């Protein structure tokens, strides 16, 4: 699958566009964890991607499910997103041409690392350093990120448990101050994250996180 993703990057670049693998696949590759879900970002607009690969575009905030050599890839145009509090879906999407600006909209630094067509890592937000130091850190203002999508509270806990990482202090305090906003999430979204959390086999660490949140509440 990875080789086919690299082929997609080369095709897009041969047509004059920038393109990278990004997100969870890159994170897992660095951690030597198997992953079969590859996301690609590009400055090509959705209609341009569809034209290059002769496929149809179903509008989904600039994302296309691209079938290539029997593999499915999500190809997304560089963009900025505008949110209302606690609403995970942006009310406005603006296509842009700048890679770093696109990466800034993501949740955690560990999910911001890219791979280019040559297989080289592009790390504009120090995600590799945080992986090496086992830290879950928000990109930009943690409070803003959590308010954009409270599911990031559960995602931070999930990554901490699955990869045995520590949640950065400012993010932990932000989680504590906003934990009640989980109630704005749909049951299905909560259940999906909780299933992963409770199946991570890290019950002791989960209890420690819960105890820490209780202590923070007491100290406040």
Label each region the model flagged.
Residues 1-220:
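Catalytic cores of the polymerase beta-like nucleotidyltransferase superfamily
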């Amino acid at each position: 699958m990875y080789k086919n993703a690299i082929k997609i990057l080369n095709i897009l670049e041969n047509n004059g566009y920038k393109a990278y693998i990004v997100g969870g696949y890159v994170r897992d590759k660095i951690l030597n964890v198997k992953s079969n879900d590859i996301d690609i970002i590009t400055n090509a607009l959705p209609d341009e991607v569809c034209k290059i690969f002769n496929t149809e575009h179903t509008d989904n905030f600039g994302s296309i499910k691209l079938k290539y050599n029997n593999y499915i890839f999500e190809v997304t145009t560089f963009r900025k997103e505008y949110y209302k509090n606690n609403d995970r879906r942006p009310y406005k999407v603006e296509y842009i041409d700048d890679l770093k600006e696109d990466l800034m909209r993501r949740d955690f630094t560990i999910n911001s690392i890219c791979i280019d067509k040559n297989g080289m890592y592009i790390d504009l937000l120090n995600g590799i350093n945080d992986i090496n130091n086992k830290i879950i850190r928000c990109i930009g203002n943690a409070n803003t990120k959590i308010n954009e999508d409270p599911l990031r509270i559960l995602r931070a806990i999930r990554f901490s448990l699955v990869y045995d990482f520590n949640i950065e202090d400012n993010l932990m305090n932000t989680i504590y101050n906003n934990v009640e906003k989980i109630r704005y999430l749909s049951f299905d979204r909560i259940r999906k994250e909780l299933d992963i959390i409770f199946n991570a086999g890290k019950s002791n660490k989960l209890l420690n996180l819960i105890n820490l949140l209780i202590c923070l509440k007491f100290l406040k």
